[in-house]
């Protein structure tokens, strides 16, 4: 039953803000006061809730027996204490060139290592098989 009143309040605030400002969804304190007079179960918190909401307006719902915050644009949380951060990395297309930069470097290092190993193997193999004395190598 209390959610019904809260939904009715927010629907009235949104409709009223669209009617007054065209496309902006911003609610002033006077709009909430005018809306809550129609619904006696929901009212502004008063002096006990002045500092309850950090970035928003405090509303007291009788059925819930507690305070509820209507956050200003750009804030979220139970007491409107968190700033809504926009993640720009997800909105942009990922840069594919930076993801391929390590690949050629790794391939180049592997290729050079294989070539060096092959040259060392050939050098040692030919050195062992060709251990001939120096006088035999001299051509007459």
Curated annotation (Swiss-Prot):
UniProt site (Cleavage (By host protease)): 96-97
- Show which residues sit on the Extracellular side of the membrane: 19-100
Q: Which residues lie on this side of the membrane: Cytoplasmic?
A: 122-140
Give me any GO biological process, just one. positive regulation of mitotic nuclear division
In the record, which residues are listed under signal peptide? 1-18
Q: Which UniProt keywords apply?
A: Disulfide bond, Early protein, EGF-like domain, Glycoprotein, Growth factor, Host membrane, Host-virus interaction, Membrane, Secreted, Signal, Transmembrane, Transmembrane helix
Alphabetized Gene3D superfamilies for the sequence: Laminin
* SUPFAM superfamilies reported in the protein's UniProt record: EGF/Laminin
Q: Which domain of life is it from?
A: Viruses
Glycosylation: which residues? 34, 95
> What is its induction behaviour?
Expressed in the early phase of the viral replicative cycle.
Q: Which GO terms describe its molecular function?
A: epidermal growth factor receptor binding; growth factor activity
Show where the EGF-like domain sits: 41-81
What cystine linkages occur within this chain?
45-58, 53-69, 71-80
Q: How is this protein annotated for GO cellular component?
A: extracellular space; host cell membrane; membrane
Chain segments annotated as transmembrane: 101-121
- Quaternary assembly: Variola growth factor interacts with host EGFR and promotes EGFR dimerization.
User: What's this protein's function?
Assistant: Stimulates cellular proliferation (hyperplasia)and mobility around infected cells to promote rapid and efficient spread of infection. This effect is beneficial for virus replication in vivo, because poxviruses replicate possibly better in proliferating cells than in quiescent cells. Acts by binding host EGFR, inducing its dimerization, autophosphorylation and leading to activation of several cellular pathways regulating cell proliferation or cell survival.
Please report which protein family the annotation says this sequence is part of. Answer: Belongs to the orthopoxvirus OPG019 family.
From the Swiss-Prot or TrEMBL record, give the protein name.
Pro-variola growth factor
């Amino acid at each position: 039953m209390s959610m019904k009143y809260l939904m009715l309040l927010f629907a009235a605030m949104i409709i009223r803000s669209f009617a007054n400002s065209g496309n902006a969804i911003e609610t002033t304190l006077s709009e909430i006061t005018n809306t809550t007079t129609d619904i006696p179960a929901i009212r502004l918190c008063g002096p006990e809730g002045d500092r309850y909401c950090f970035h928003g307006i405090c509303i007291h719902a009788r059925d819930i027996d507690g305070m509820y915050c209507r956050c200003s644009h750009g804030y979220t949380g139970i007491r409107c204490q968190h700033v809504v951060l926009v993640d720009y990395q997800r909105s942009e297309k990922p840069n594919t060139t930076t993801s391929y930069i390590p690949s050629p470097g790794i391939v180049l290092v592997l290729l050079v290592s294989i070539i060096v190993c092959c040259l060392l193997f050939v050098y040692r193999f030919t050195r062992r098989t060709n251990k001939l004395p120096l006088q035999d190598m001299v051509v007459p």
